[in-house]
Amino acid sequence: GRSPEGAVRAPGRVNLIGEHTDYNDGFVLPIAIERETVALFARRDDGIVNLASTLSDETASVDLAAPIVKAAPAWADYCRGVLAGLQAAGIELSGMDIYFDSTVPLGGGLSSSASLEVATGLAMMGGESSLDDLTLAKICQKAEHDFAGTPCGIMDQSISVMGQAGKALLMDCQSGETQQIPFNDPKLVLLVADTKVKHELNDGGYAARRDQCYAAAKILGAPMLRDTDAATLEAKRDALSDVEFRRARHVLGEIKRTLDAVAALGADDYHTFGELMVASHVSLRDDYNVSCDELDAIVDLAC
């Protein structure tokens, strides 16, 4: 029943190319979309943060003076994690009423959770971040690790914080360096298709693939897969299981495809860019086993 003091927005995203490379210290090329999470906020003077959403009948209250832990409802754990992270970063927080509305489809692969986390962080800081972009993204990433149980990479939170209209974001997930890549040619249309197949990042499949990549890197004598190459992978093929080999082959190939895609965009070579996107899908389907019949059909139709 209160009037908001302000509002913040955090967009969802699609990843043009660079799939499952972020947690392997590779390169990614996401772009923000118009679907977004909006948070209306109003300060309180009692140290209580009240969380409500148009997408849930369940609300949550968090006492900033008490230890912040996971609790029901589950959707609010993403917010609780951000509150805990901001406190740990030394940000002085006040009580707040926050009301969320989101047009990012849940479980559709458009980073609804990251946009919720970023919107929470921005709202808690009164609409103006006192942190640099990467630090805020890392706080939101840690929230997802610790409070949602998903060992995600840094990409989703980063593009939600740093996304700009008409530009994709090339991110080096090892150094944290970013570059805005123009993606606004009027001849270009980015079609985002919904397969209607839902996913859960915390269902175990994501974590299993991450672990397989880390195991492969260890066998290859590298801190992360980013730090090795295709020749080393082939030379040590017999030391890896078939699954580990295929996971590593995807990651190394995807890192190269991502850099090649940026070069293609810079040359306005959209045909090559499209070929690289298709090659990425084939690798995700065959080596990473993360596609589905519906997605395969959409790619086949597009080609």
Per-range role (PLM):
Residues 1-114, 118-133, 138-142, 147, ...:
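ATP-binding N-lobe of GHMP and related small-molecule kinases
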Residues 2-13, 38-72, 167-303:
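C-terminal nucleotide
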